[in-house]
Each structure stands twice: as structure tokens, then as C-alpha cells.
């Protein structure tokens, strides 16, 4: 039995899809365990970009099983669209399995997401307006509709009528907005359910059987640790648990069956939306990193905020996710800079701290304490071994590993599969 969890260690967009795709070559089952279509991942195969939001990266390996776990919230309309996109590109989806326990995102979730965000005014949290939060709210309130319910027409009708009655009271009375008409969505979404029916199964059984039979299982997280609802920069977080612990809840696999946790990070930091970001850059260096790194959201298209590598954030992520290995991406983006910086601690009201505060007010007052390293000018996109990196780039990689306290198993010098280099196999 070997199972590996891939988690983002920053605020998402670290290149998890690329690393999952890379590690999938040696896995037999690939599963997602949380989130929805609010997070996008981009995979480059033979120079062609594929952008996915719901379906695991392993779908590009037809001989492997790809799983949408019970911890996800699934917009059936988005899922059917994504399946059609893959079919048009010649990608088979016969290897997809969808948990019958996953919850369903419906139009009223998206509308409520929009209205709640608008009502916050200047205190917006930067939601993607995909209905993720309201769907998880319904799940916690025990009024959610699951995939299993969607497939049964009578049950779906009864639960949709009940939920719409409640949500429409909110829309009309609280938000002074239009009600959603039952007939406008019932048949449409029931039909989506019928289109995905052949993929639906108890995925916990599949995953546990695979592990019990010695197969390699890869768990793919969405977003990142710093967006975790418990461990992230609350309330500027997502509504689920991207941390490695989320696997056990979101997949139905017990914690004793998790072997390794790979933390994915970039050689710098980025985030989309509002919230604390101690190392954020507002100068020409930040603009250069954004442009060279193509830092625009896969889902929203919004320019990402960028900053220097933050080892305080990384140590927090290592601790709360039990990270055993690190995948360091986008080293090439820093090429051409005379000096590169790493945040090693914060100055909080004149006191040096090496932990990430829970208080937003304290975070606002935190000033990064940097360690400066000499940069490198060489084009490193063709490098295939650590020893072939320029000395300064090599020193940067080693310093990142030292500060985070985790060994680096892969490093990447570009978006392609062939640009990910192995230092140590996580499957051994």
C-alpha cells in the first residue's frame, strides 16, 4: 500500500495540477477530496494546455481511475461541460468515478453567493461566485442535496422544492431579489444527473479496495493550506479543508492509510482575492514576476497578487499538513533578477516572530524580515538536473529546503511535464 497526498502550501495556484499529473504516471488511482469548480488546474501535455476545474488531473491516463470524492461539492452543469470539453479534445472519461455522497451545487447556491458577497460591501472576501460556500453551508445545515438524491427524480423534486422555498424567502425578503422558479431548473438539473449517472458509485469502496490490494493512490487537493477554513487566513479562506487531514473526511479513507504528503509551492508567492499577504510586492519586481509567471487566475482570470517566498507561511503549512516532501515550482520565473529574497520571520510591533498569527489585525502589522540571496541571469528552462542549475539558483533551492525543514523531491523550471525534475521518488 502506498498513498500520497498532494497539497498546496500557499494560497493556491502553486502548480498542484502539474505535480499531480507528473506523479500520476506512477499511480493507479487519482482522487480529489474537497472543493469544487472554484479552483482551476492547468496541465500541459505535448505543449497543449488543458484547464480543468472539477475532474482530477489523472483523467489524462485512461488506464487509471480518477475519483471525485465525497468531500467535493459538484456543479452538475459545470461537470457536464467539462466532460464535453474533454470528449471534444479526444480524451476518454470512462475511467471517471463520482461519489454518490458528494453534494450538489445548484443555481440558488450561486445566486446566494453573489448576493452575500455584494452585501459585504468593502468587506468582501473575494469569492469566485461559484456557489461553493453556500453549498457547504447547506451540507453543514443538513439540507444539502447529494449526487445520490439528484439521480432519484422523486427525491430530487421533493428536496429541491423544500430548499427553493427557503432560499426564495431569503432572496425576496432579505436581499430584495427575484425568486428562482422551480420549473426553470428541475428538469435541466435532473437531466445533468442522468448524464453523469454512469460514473456514480460509492468511491470510498473503490479507494479502500485499491489500497488494500497494494495499489498506488494519489490524492489531489485544491486551493492551498493558507485557504483552509480552519488553518488558513480566516475569513479570507475557502469553505473546505485543503490540508492533508481533509483527505480522510473527503474520500472515506482512514488516516492510517496515508503514507506521504507532498507540499507544492512556487519559488515565490501568489494569491487571488483579498486577505493578508505579508510579502506582497507592489513594485516593478512584482509586476515582472506576475507577467513572466503568467499570474492570472485559471477560474477568474483575475491578476494574482505576487510576493517573495515566505518561509513562515511554509513552516505553518508543513506543520498543519504533516508535509514529508516538497515540490518547488516556477524557479525559472526568478531568472534575471539581481537579488532574490526569502522571508525568514516577521517583525510584529518590534518583536521578531517566526510563526503565522491567527489574528488579522496582527497580520496587518507584520513586516517581513528578509534574507537576500544573489540572483541568476541564465535561462534555466532546459535544466534537467539540480547540479546543472546556476550556482545561485542551486543555493536558493537548498536554502528554501533548509528554512522550511522539508526535503525537496521535485523542482520545476517551466510548465511542461518534461520540465519537472525528480530528486527523490515519493513512491518508494
Curated annotation (Swiss-Prot):
Which of this chain's residues are annotated to bind IMP?
A: 13-16, 38-41, 128, 142, 223, 238, 302
The positions annotated for binding substrate are 298-304
Write out the catalysed reaction.
IMP + L-aspartate + GTP = N(6)-(1,2-dicarboxyethyl)-AMP + GDP + phosphate + 2 H(+)
Give the location in the cell.
Cytoplasm
Q: Does the keyword Nucleotide-binding apply?
A: yes
Provide the transmembrane region boundaries.
none
Pathway annotation from the record:
Purine metabolism; AMP biosynthesis via de novo pathway; AMP from IMP: step 1/2
InterPro entries, A to Z: Adenylosuccin_syn_GTP-bd, Adenylosuccin_syn_Lys_AS, Adenylosuccinate_synth_dom1, Adenylosuccinate_synth_dom2, Adenylosuccinate_synth_dom3, Adenylosuccinate_synthetase, P-loop_NTPase
Protein name listed in UniProt: Adenylosuccinate synthetase
Amino acid at each position: 500500500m502506498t498513498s500520497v497526498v498532494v497539497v498546496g502550501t500557499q494560497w493556491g495556484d502553486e502548480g498542484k495540477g502539474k505535480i499531480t499529473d507528473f506523479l500520476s504516471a506512477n499511480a493507479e488511482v487519482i482522487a480529489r477530496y474537497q472543493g469544487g469548480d472554484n479552483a482551476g488546474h492547468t496541465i500541459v501535455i505535448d505543449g497543449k494546455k488543458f484547464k480543468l476545474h472539477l475532474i482530477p488531473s489523472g483523467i489524462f491516463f485512461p488506464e487509471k481511475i480518477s475519483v471525485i470524492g465525497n468531500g467535493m461539492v459538484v456543479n452538475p452543469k459545470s461537470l457536464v461541460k467539462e466532460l464535453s470539453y474533454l470528449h471534444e479534445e479526444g480524451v476518454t472519461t470512462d475511467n471517471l468515478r463520482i461519489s454518490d455522497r458528494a453534494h450538489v451545487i445548484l443555481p440558488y447556491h450561486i445566486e446566494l453567493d453573489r448576493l452575500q458577497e455584494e452585501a459585504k460591501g468593502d468587506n468582501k472576501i473575494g469569492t469566485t461566485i461559484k456557489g461553493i460556500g453556500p453549498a457547504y453551508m447547506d451540507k453543514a445545515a443538513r439540507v444539502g442535496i447529494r449526487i445520490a438524491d439528484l439521480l432519484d427524480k422523486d427525491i430530487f423534486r421533493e428536496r429541491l422544492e423544500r430548499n427553493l422555498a427557503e432560499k426564495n424567502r431569503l432572496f425576496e425578503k432579505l436581499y430584495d431579489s427575484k425568486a428562482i422558479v422551480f420549473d426553470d431548473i428541475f428538469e435541466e438539473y435532473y437531466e445533468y444527473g442522468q448524464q453523469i449517472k454512469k460514473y456514480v458509485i460509492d468511491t470510498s469502496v473503490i479507494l479502500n479496495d485499491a489500497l488494500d490490494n497494494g495499489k498506488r493512490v494519489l490524492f489531489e487537493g485544491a486551493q492551498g493550506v493558507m485557504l483552509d477554513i480552519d488553518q488558513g487566513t480566516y475569513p479570507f479562506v475557502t469553505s473546505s479543508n485543503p490540508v492533508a487531514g481533509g483527505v480522510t473526511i473527503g474520500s472515506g479513507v482512514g488516516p492510517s492509510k496515508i503514507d506521504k504528503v507532498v507540499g507544492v509551492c512556487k519559488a515565490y508567492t501568489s494569491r487571488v482575492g483579498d486577505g493578508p499577504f505579508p510579502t506582497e510586492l507592489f513594485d516593478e519586481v512584482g509586476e515582472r514576476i506576475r507577467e513572466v509567471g503568467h499570474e492570472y487566475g485559471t477560474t477568474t482570470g483575475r491578476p494574482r497578487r505576487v510576493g517573495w517566498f515566505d518561509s513562515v507561511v511554509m513552516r505553518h503549512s508543513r506543520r498543519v499538513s504533516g508535509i514529508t516532501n516538497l515540490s518547488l515550482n516556477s524557479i525559472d520565473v526568478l531568472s534575471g533578477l539581481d537579488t532574490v529574497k526569502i522571508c525568514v520571520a516577521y517583525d510584529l510591533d518590534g518583536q521578531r516572530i517566526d510563526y503565522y498569527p491567527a489574528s488579522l489585525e496582527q497580520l496587518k502589522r507584520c513586516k517581513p524580515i528578509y534574507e537576500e540571496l544573489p540572483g541568476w541571469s541564465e535561462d534555466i528552462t532546459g535544466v534537467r538536473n539540480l547540479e546543472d542549475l546556476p550556482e545561485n539558483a542551486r543555493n536558493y533551492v537548498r536554502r528554501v529546503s533548509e528554512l522550511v525543514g522539508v526535503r525537496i523531491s521535485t523542482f520545476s523550471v517551466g510548465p511542461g511535464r518534461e520540465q519537472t525534475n525528480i530528486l527523490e521518488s515519493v513512491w518508494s
